[in-house]
C-alpha cells in the first residue's frame, strides 16, 4: 500500500464540529459553515487517511504495521506477472474479482450505502497506452448498457466527469455513475483510467519487472 500511494494519498477531507465534536466529510457539506447537528462552528479541514492499520505479530513497531485493503484492485496488480506468465494473454485483456474491502469512513450512514466493511467488485482492463481513449469510451457505453440490462431506470442515473482536483491519485480520467437514491444523488459505480501507475509503482518498489 506504500508503493501504490494509498498510505500517503488515500484520504478524505475531514472537519470536526467544535461544539458537539461530530466529524463530517468536508466535501459533502455543500458549503455549509455550521454543523448540521447542533449549529456549532467547524475547525480546520484536515486530511483523514481511510485505511485501517493494524500490527502483524507480537511486536507493535513500524516493521509490523499492516493494512486492511481499501480496494480489491491491488491484488490484481501485484499478481499481474503471475497472470501473464500462467495464461499468456494478449492485450487487451481484463481481470475481474469480488471480495471484501475495508475503509475507515469518517461518517458511515444511509443503511449499507456507506459502511466500513463491504463487498466490492472490480474489473481491471489492460490496454496499450495509445488505445486508452477508445477503450474508455467502450467501457462507458457498456456500463450504461448494463444499467438498462439489470432493470435500473436510466433516467435515475447520471454521469459525472470528475475534475482533476477530485480524482484519485492514480487516475488520469474518471467518470462516476451517480444514482438518485432516496437520500440524494450518490455514486453507483465508476470508471477510471489508471494509466500504468499501479504496475510501474509496484515494479519500482519490488525491483521486479511486471
Briefly describe each language-model feature range.
Residues 1-210:
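TRNA-recognition modules of translation machinery and tRNA-sensing kinases, especially anticodon-binding
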